[in-house]
Amino acid sequence: DLTAQWNKKIDSMGCQMDGANIITPKEDQENFDFIWMMVWPSEQARDACWSDWLENHDAEWRETISGVWDYSSENAFLFSSEIGRLPKSWSTSDSFTHSYFFCNFNEGSDFNTLHDYRADLNSITTLSDNHWYMLLDPMFDPDPRPDFVWLDIWPTDEARESDLAIWNSTNLPAKAAEMVTCGESIDATMFD
């Protein structure tokens, strides 16, 4: 199992890493088949591990995965994160549903508007126990650059659908549509 081999290698390197997940898009994507997402305690921890990896482990790993998949170190992107809401309880599932929204503020809206929207969202107490979200800020220069990336996480598609029904029964969809454009309207890129 390549995942177990990778985990063993990372453990032997002594990297300070908070976790890693492989997420696969629900719809085919032109530029990738999956994303290997790594969570770091700091940018310094990420840079130290990444430098060690590139200098001492990258070539051997490429041989190990040859014919299975390939990756480009030029496509390793760092985001800072801010947790918007923690789950009421952590899911014990090994799989999750992720929704990424790459958003820009509409005219008249800004981070203060987003703050108010988040306060309204966080006041809803009936969302599923395992839902949580965070805001991501690219620490690189994507083109086009979003004002922020909104990431929702659920343990299942069913929990997501239930929460969306609750969200849609409020005034929050209208507030979101007035505040931001994410994709062509408010579109998410969905991952398992």
Tell where the protein language model's regions lie, with residue ranges.
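Short S/T/G/P-rich N-terminal loop/turn motif that feeds into the first structured element of a domain
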Residues: 1-192
